[in-house]
Swiss-Prot record:
This is Glyco-Gag protein. InterPro entries: G_retro_matrix (IPR000840), G_retro_matrix_sf (IPR036946), Gag_p12 (IPR002079), Gag_P30 (IPR003036), Retrov_capsid_N (IPR008919), Retroviral_Gag-Pol_poly (IPR050462), Retrovr_matrix (IPR010999), Znf_CCHC (IPR001878). Plays a role in viral particle release. Presumably acts by facilitating the fission of the virion bud at the cell surface. May prevent the antiviral activity of murine APOBEC3. It comes from the Viruses. Keywords: Glycoprotein, Host cell membrane, Host membrane, Membrane, Transmembrane, Transmembrane helix. It comes from Cas-Br-E murine leukemia virus. One of its GO terms (molecular function) is zinc ion binding. Residues 520-552, 572-605 have a biased composition (Basic and acidic residues). Glycosylated by host. Cleaved by host near the middle of the molecule, releasing the c-terminal half containing capsid and nucleoprotein domains op GAG.
Length: 624
């Protein structure tokens, strides 16, 4: 080692073998110090720790050691991942919200059956963010508890600024999933309690329906605990309860809870029982048995009197409100049609003040509702029968705040009737647009439109764009003239030629127009007539062409005959008098006497008339 730099003067010191049998190298290898020598200098000779203390040296020297270490690390990593996965999978819970998202196609199909459309993002937002803030027990993961769903629906259908019309399709769909659950929802719906034997069935079991009916009543699903006794409402002098925030009033004595199906179908009490008195009076419904109706029928029936003459309240169903809104144009687009709908609802259903606000809030926008209420308050009349400006009379007849009217008294019902009349007047006045006669003139009869339908459109245009009432006898002449001038061309021409047109009423004109309209040819007859007229026109044109051709040939023949006759006669004359042709005359030769020096007109030999001969005119020569 003398050639190695830095090792000059070094000596080799042998280390003794270790006699301890329990000292081994890594993975059973013999100790590294056996037969190993340390190079030390002679200047600082001292003891160093053996190399076996430095295990990384084995990692660099042994491939098997590296393979074993990598296998151990990989096994530990796989074990940790397996334990973490097992722990998390064991904690995964299926919630109603995740269940509906997994079966979203079925949810959309259910919404389509309810005549609504739902979006997945808004579905998640309403379920996890909006509805838990209603404080009715709705969890963020959703629920199929019918009681909680009904409470949420009451909040959604609240009138005024507290309602949420944009959430109606979603809560209606969720309610349909709970009340008519598909197979994947049934395990999560609480089973209905069996009907006790002591409770007789009030109505026969209706057939199963694919479209569940909705109601604004809270679900009365009996709880597992003791059911508290229903509270009987005070006498009719007490204040009205809020149907959208309070429980519905009881109508019969507490008894065994009926089934959900019986409650949804609106069953009547047994014959021997009478409903408890209640101050809630509005639309009347009989408590007697009703025929089983299809599930798609309306739940808001006209008012009826009960067995004891007591008025009973039933609110509008959500399906009625939503169908009215979707199946009719907006108030701004067609105020007449929506006004007619609300008028029929006011007459047949006799809604309360709260119901009127709910109806207006559903069918009208905020601006339209304010305009209707303003026009209705303008229509309030005083004692003299003219519109009044007194605030107390206006607020008494058409209040903006909820009035304290007792619907079981005649005075309360009179207030309600007057309120409906004023509301209808407000709808009619608010639906009128500024006067625009051009709009009325632009209403014309369609090609296949009947005169009656055209007259209805014309009258609607008069109501909407003019301040005139088309039903007023004083406006009948204007409406009649518009009907004649704006009818279909064939009908208008025949109406204008009617005898004694001035004495005809609008009804007479409509009947005459109906006769003309009904005598119109069918499309097949019109096509056949056009075909026949085309053939006749073609035949006439062909005959005219033939006649013109014949006339042209005749004229050509006549001209040719004249030409030939002229040529033949000229040739004949040339042959007969060819030799007797007169000789050529000179320039100064007379054609009469053949002498030169003058012309025939100045010939002295030519006999003259009684005027005597003309003086001879001399021809001057150049030399003269």
């Amino acid at each position: 080692l003398g050639d190695v730099p830095g090792t000059s003067g070094a000596v080799f010191v042998a280390r003794p073998e270790s006699k301890s049998p329990d000292r081994f190298g890594l993975f059973g290898a013999p100790p590294l110090e056996e037969g190993y020598v340390i190079l030390v200098g002679d200047e600082n000779l001292k003891q160093f720790p053996p190399p076996s203390k430095f295990l990384p040296s084995v990692w660099n020297r042994s491939r098997a050691a590296r393979l074993v270490c990598c296998s151990i690390v990989l096994c530990c990593l796989c074990l940790a991942v397996f334990l973490y996965w097992s722990e998390n999978m064991g904690q995964t819970v299926t919630t109603p919200l995740s269940l509906t998202l997994d079966h979203w196609k079925d949810v959309e199909r259910t919404a389509h059956n309810q005549s609504v459309d739902v979006k997945k993002r808004r579905w998640v937002t309403f379920c996890s963010v909006e509805w838990p803030t209603f404080n009715v027990g709705w969890p963020q993961d959703g629920t199929f508890n019918r009681d909680i769903i009904t409470q949420v629906k009451i909040k959604v259908f609240s009138p005024g600024p507290h309602g949420h019309p944009d959430q109606v399709p979603y809560i209606v769909t969720w309610e349909a999933l709970a009340f008519d659950p598909p197979p994947w929802v049934k395990p999560f719906v609480h089973p209905k309690p069996p009907l006790p034997p002591s409770a007789p069935s009030l109505l026969p079991e209706p057939p199963l329906s694919t479209s569940p009916r909705s109601s604004l009543y809270p679900a009365l699903t009996p709880s597992l605990g003791a059911k508290p006794k229903p509270q009987v409402l005070p006498d009719s002098g007490g204040p009205l309860i809020d149907l959208l925030t309070e429980d519905p009033p009881p109508y019969r004595d507490p008894g065994p809870p009926p089934s959900d199906r019986d409650r949804d179908d609106g069953e009547a009490a047994p014959a021997g029982e009478a409903p408890d008195p209640s101050p809630m009076a509005s639309r009347l419904r009989g408590r007697r048995e009703l025929p089983v109706a299809d599930s798609t029928t309306s739940q808001a029936f006209p008012l009826r009197s009960g067995g004891n003459g007591q008025l009973q309240y039933w609110p509008f169903s959500s399906s009625d409100l939503y169908n009215w809104k979707n199946n009719n144009p907006s108030f701004s687009e067609d105020p007449g049609k929506l006004t007619a709908l609300i008028e029929s609802v006011l007459l047949t259903h006799q809604p309360t003040w709260d119901d009127c606000q709910q109806l207006l809030g559903t069918l009208l926008t905020g601006e339209e509702k304010q305009r209707v209420l303003l026009e209705a308050r303008k229509a309030v009349r005083g004692e003299d029968g003219r519109p009044t400006q007194l605030p107390n009379e206006i607020n008494d007849a058409f209040p903006l705040e909820r009035p304290d009217w007792d619907y079981n008294t005649q005075r309360g019902r009179n207030h309600l009737v007057l309120y409906r009349q004023l509301l209808l007047a407000g709808l009619q006045n608010a639906g009128r647009s500024p006067t625009n006669l051009a709009k009325v003139k632009g209403i014309t009869q369609g090609p296949n439109e009947s005169p009656s339908a055209f007259l209805e459109r014309l009258k609607e245009a008069y109501r909407r764009y003019t301040p005139y009432d088309p039903e007023d006898p004083g406006q009948e002449t204007n409406v009649s003239m518009s009907f004649i001038w704006q009818s279909a061309p064939d009908i208008g021409r025949k109406l204008e030629r009617l005898e004694d047109l001035k004495s005809k009423t609008l009804g007479d004109l409509v009947r005459e127009a109906e006769k003309i309209f009904n005598k119109r040819e069918t499309p097949e007859e019109r096509e056949e007539r056009i075909k026949r007229e085309t053939e006749e026109k073609e035949e006439r044109r062909r005959a005219e062409d033939e006649q013109k051709e014949k006339e042209r040939d005749r004229r050509r023949h006549r001209e040719m005959s004249k030409l030939l006759a002229t040529v033949v006669s000229g040739q004949k004359q040339d042959r007969q008098g060819g030799e007797r042709r007169r000789p050529q005359l000179d320039k100064d030769q007379c054609a009469y006497c053949k002498e030169k020096g003058h012309w025939a007109k100045d010939c002295p030999k030519k006999p003259r008339g009684p005027r005597g001969p003309r003086p001879q005119t001399s021809l001057l020569a150049l030399d003269d």
